[in-house]
Amino acid sequence: SALAKLTLTVSISSTNRPTLITLPRNTQFTTSIDSVSYTFQTREVYSATPDANGLYTFKTSDGSSEIPVYEGTEKTKTFFVGETSDAQIYVVPDITMDTTTIRVRVFDTAVSSTFDTYTNINTASRITSNSTHYQIKEVPNGYYEIIFGDGTSTGKAPSARNKIIIDSLS
């Protein structure tokens, strides 16, 4: 997916300004070049607080005012973890998946609203048995397999009856 970086500011002149405003995940921005439209979207939530003049500048979690937006269509794949004695294989059937935009969430149950977010193991600086990381591997048909930890040396493994939701842009 193509990546653009935006600096987003909002000016609110009211005396009853909010202390915080948020830019939701999947907020879309459209541009056009040579009469061709391109739609980009955020992949996470960003927030902004006002300065003394009521100007809000959205920032990333590391404080940068450059907000990344990605071109593409979000696709979601849901898996349910079987008995842990069974081999667990999670293949996302999408040959156009942008692996840099993957978000992996593991829910306790099929109806649970709380989840752990798993991150790519390549971003880990330290791995313990409780680390929530995944690995990604392209399989021969061009799809991608998501591989979780083993519960010891490569991090936490999802448990039986967990629900796994993987979304990414394509």
Locate the predicted segments by residue:
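Signature of Asx- and small-polar-rich beta-strand/turn repeats characteristic
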Residues: 1-170
